[in-house]
Design a protein with these regions (language model features):
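Conserved active-site and cofactor/substrate-binding residues in soluble primary-metabolism enzymes
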Residues: 2, 16, 20-23, 27, ...
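Adenosine-phosphate binding glycine-rich loop
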Residues: 2-24, 219, 331-443
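Generic secondary-structure signature for well-ordered alpha-helical cores
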Residues: 12-16, 30-38, 108-112, 133, ...
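Buried hydrophobic packing segments
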Residues: 103-107, 176, 212-220, 244, ...
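General beta-strand structural signal in soluble alpha/beta enzymes
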Residues: 159-163, 186-191, 257-260, 299, ...
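Glycine-rich phosphate/diphosphate-binding loop of Rossmann-like nucleotide-binding domains
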Residues: 192-195, 200-309
């Protein structure tokens, strides 16, 4: 049994109740076999044992009072996974599905995603099983203030700089930042995704979706294809999906689907983004409302099944949304590229099937790195007490995403897996972190 296989078996036994973390670790570790074969220094320094174990796991209760005067208690998490190349960086997810395994999976992925950006940021993730949906502003504020009362003991601009994620938008970041400032009595860039009036960055809201398209465009061009004129299926209806749709349309593609937690829409004429923004960002309603704006569109209840014919698929909703059966439908319909806008939205089985069929596949740790890259750019602006223009940030973002594609493509080719961007992303992200860990000694 190889060193990698041995460590993977140990990891599975140690984390048996954390399937999401095991899935993420399996995908990364299996692709690193050729790296360990050619570089014995990684085994000699126990890199796998160290990189798969968080540097610190923080779990705490979050008590708050609802509008009826009743005390509610949620569970909060912060996993500070790896700081070899910079302070911990990763979002705070507020969703009922959040547990330690989910946060560890997200934090582990974040290590390599952050490494790929080329910026000095380590990997971390946090959140709570609190659900902001259906809560009043006062209840959300009460939760956020209680959450930050504990979390503030463990974070800081040069220690751990959290950001938003599912359920954590500008409102939640604002409440958390206010509480952090109140308790610590310091005004620093400790959270990213802040409001523009108090330290936020232009283009941060658009960054993940725009970055997804910049990398997809680079991948397609390198393989003799073009996003211009392509028919695109998008899942999700949050920031990533909305701004991926916006940039795809701007680049000349036609996006025909979007989906939320209750159903999905198909618009053969192309998604009306103004309608989507009004429904989702202004009215905060479900996609069922879309038909009121576009009567010729279709609304389907339930999970989006990727049955619509497309050239490019962009899963932008949540983990494991695209399964093996979905992959078969994409293949049958002639899809030639899939790029992950969400974190690990494609199951391992589906990923293998898509790659085996010859479909270009860009993994989330590379394809959706635009969000964290722009968060790091926000950190830079905060450190310098500067504010860059939208065009400046967007240009830096595009440059970062194109370089990510070049680096993962080169890494895959170097180790005999040309065109396998999953392997390339894992290797390129891993080597930078692993080499830094060795240079810093056993810590």
């Amino acid at each position: 049994m190889s060193y990698v296989s041995e460590q993977l078996e140990k990891l599975k036994a140690k984390n048996a109740n954390e399937p999401e973390f095991i899935q993420a670790a399996t995908e990364v570790l299996t692709s690193l076999e050729p790296v360990f074969e050619q570089n014995p220094k990684y085994e000699e320094n126990g890199i796998l044992e160290r990189i798969t174990e968080p540097e610190r796991v923080i779990m705490f209760r979050v008590p708050w009072v609802d509008d009826n005067g009743k005390v509610q208690v949620n569970r909060g998490f912060r996993v500070q996974f790896n700081s070899a190349i910079g302070p911990y960086k990763g979002g705070l997810r507020l969703h009922p599905s959040v547990n330690l395994g989910v946060i560890k999976f997200l934090g582990f992925e974040q290590i390599f995603k952050n490494s790929l950006t080329g910026l000095p940021i380590g990997g971390g993730k946090g959140g709570s099983d609190f659900d902001p949906k259906g809560k009043s502003d006062r209840e959300v504020m009460a939760f956020c203030q209680s959450f930050m009362t504990e979390l503030c003991k463990h974070i800081g601009a040069d220690t751990d700089d959290p950001a938003g994620d599912i359920g954590t938008g500008a409102r939640e970041i604002g409440y958390m930042f206010g509480q952090y400032k109140r308790i610590r009595n310091v005004y620093e860039g400790v959270l990213t995704g802040k409001g523009l009036n108090w330290g936020g960055s232009l283009a941060r809201t658009e960054a993940t979706g725009y970055g997804l398209l910049y990398l997809t465009e680079a991948m397609l061009k390198d393989n003799g294809k073009d996003i211009k004129g392509a028919t695109v299926c998008v899942s999700g209806a949050g920031n990533v999906a909305i701004y991926a749709t916006e940039k795809a349309t701007e680049l000349g593609a036609k996006v025909v689907t979007m989906a939320d937690s209750t159903g999905w829409i198909y618009d053969a004429e192309g998604i009306d983004l103004d309608a989507i923004k009004e429904i989702k960002e202004v009215k905060r309603q479900r996609l069922t409302e879309y038909k009121n704006y576009r009567p010729n569109s279709e609304y389907h209840e339930g999970k989006f099944d990727w049955s619509v014919k497309c050239d490019v698929a962009l899963p932008c909703a949540t983990q494991n949304e695209l399964n093996e059966e979905d992959a078969k439908r994409l293949i049958a319909n002639g899809c030639y590229a899939v790029a992950e806008g969400a974190n690990m939205p494609t199951t391992l089985e589906a990923t293998k099937l898509l790659q085996k069929s010859g479909i270009l596949f860009a993994p989330g740790k590379a394809a959706n790195a635009g969000g964290v890259a722009t968060s790091a750019l926000e950190m830079s602006q905060n450190s310098q007490r500067l504010s860059w223009t939208f065009e400046e940030v967007d240009a830096k973002l595009k440059n970062i995403m194109v370089n990510i594609y070049k680096n993962i493509s080169a890494a895959a080719k170097k180790y005999g897996h040309e065109g396998d961007y999953v392997v390339g992303a894992n290797i390129a992200g891993f080597e930078k972190v692993a080499d830094s860990m060795i240079q810093q000694g056993v810590c």
